[in-house]
Amino acid sequence: MSGEPPFLFLHIPRTAGTTLNRLLERHFPPETVLSLYSREELQRYAVIDVAFLARLRLIQGHILLSDYDRFTFYDAPVRAFTFVREPVSRVISEYFFLRTWPANHLYALLNEQHITLSEYVTSKHKLLRYKGGNFMTRVLSGIDPDVEPDAALERAKSNLRDRFLFFGLTEAFNASLLLLAEAMGLGDLLYERQNALRRPVSQRADEDERALIAARNTLDTALYDFAKQLFAERVAAKGSSFTARLTRYETLLGKYQKVCALVETRLGVPLGEIEKPKD
């Protein structure tokens, strides 16, 4: 154990988190990583002992902090980080991913009941009611945005600015990785995209659907605009040397991903709706 609090990746769905998880897992021994995604994992690790917690260096999952005032998880301090994404695209991507990936717990519900995108966004079903409206604001603030919208938005903003060790943007993923590497002391940042829908989100919803999603996510849009501006300021503060590093990194990454694609083609890896789906 390093003596430092563990890192905690608060993974908002459809923000390139699966790609990031695979990259991060290369930097930490398996016994020091705790993943909390499935119901089984969440139930199994609902309570953990002090010795188990002490050896953890990375916790990752679709999770909430246990205490947003003290910024703790398992009643212990953590160094939390997250990624955010343009809200309309994120919701559309989540809906179509959940309808496409059979292993998720909403696949049967969405397909057997033929739930449309508009219904997904407005549903009061107990499994869907928090999905389509201001989800990022909810999980980054710890406040119900339906009850206290202004407080939730302001808390989410201040948490991103002051409490999170780091936040990145899905739309600036490579630049985000370089900044995350600095914050976490990481080395190798080469990656292949994981769990991505092959057909662009822009082709998956009509104008009326996009307008409905936007109307249901006004807080998330304000939060994303805030995050985008703050991220740009932090990148600008790094100066021209960071821009040069990013250019070199993206050149190397492009070569790496090209080689990976050639290997997959030669191996005859089948193409599906989801690119390199998670297990």
Protein language model features and the residues they cover:
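Short hydrophobic/aromatic segments of transmembrane alpha-helices and their interfaces
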Residues: 2-4, 72-73, 205-206
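PAPS-dependent sulfotransferase catalytic core
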Residues: 1-56, 87, 94, 99-100, ...
